[in-house]
Amino acid sequence: IKGLTQLLKKKNAYNVVEKHLSKYKGKTIAIDTSILLYKYRYGSGNDQLSHIYGILGKCMSFLSNGVIPIFVHDGEPPEEKSEVLSKRTDQRTKLNNKIEDLKIQIREYTTDSDSEDDGLGKLKVSLSKLEKQVVRVSQIHRKEVFYLLKLLGLPNFVAEGEGEAGCVELQKKGIADYVYSEDMDVLTFGCTRFLRASNKKDYYTEISLNDILSNLEMNQDEFVDLCILCGCDYTSTIRGIGPKTA
């Protein structure tokens, strides 16, 4: 949801209280695995094991604090999201084309000059920045994490649709106490207790949907309408309407 975090903070819709993971000892937390994969793959460059190390670290963190994790993986995306997925594919293609162009310029620059100067240095910096923007999460990465968790004996499954929606479904059924994600979209699915990672190691910000609805003086349906007006992956935006005007 575009600008939702900033909007909720501006309206003081929830209290930002950070808790150490140990405070959730004995609790079950459904984890949006896709979010973690992108987090660990971001800026990893040629490191093909960053997602493995990252997931292992997360498992150790949860288990050592007595927390039971359930890893939920993305299934097939809903049809409503096809347009935004197509746009993202186009953006990645354009970004990859820019990267290839820069690589060609660097090769030509190196061939024409025996020494590095400011021009070549700037090209390399630009290339590095662009490469970090291309987050590569392949089906191989997803399968590796799935089988790693299976070998560790930890509960993990593929949702029917998106992983975040699957996490919320587990909470609604009483299987999970909390949902861990970095995506505020879980609130629109009706996630009542939502955890986001803090900048401090093993600390999390707990967000209560009931607090948000109470402070905004809205019910769940009205909140979902607000999120749609802000802009989401499932519908086109309305011209002139966004987080500030919704």
Segments the model singles out, each with a brief description of its role:
Residues S86-A246:
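Extended two-metal-dependent nuclease catalytic cores across DNA- and RNA-processing enzymes
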Residues I1-I104:
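Non-catalytic, usually N-terminal nucleic-acid engagement modules in DNA/RNA processing proteins
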